[in-house]
């Protein structure tokens, strides 16, 4: 019975570690993925660099 508890605990720790490491990886790499240029056809930037709609 003790061996079953140990293996269950090990499985829980492994799953928790994988989830935490996946979350940390997503947070660290997200800032490098989301750089989108701010100049589609209907948008212009003002002097401060803020996107403005032009109709």
Swiss-Prot record:
N-terminal signal peptide: 1-31
Modified residues (Pyrrolidone carboxylic acid): 32
Localization of this protein: Secreted
Mod. after translation: Contains 1 disulfide bond.
Main location: secreted
Record's GO cellular component terms: extracellular region
Disulphide bonds in the chain: none
UniProt protein name: U17-myrmicitoxin-Mri1b
Lineage: Eukaryota, Metazoa, Ecdysozoa, Arthropoda, Hexapoda
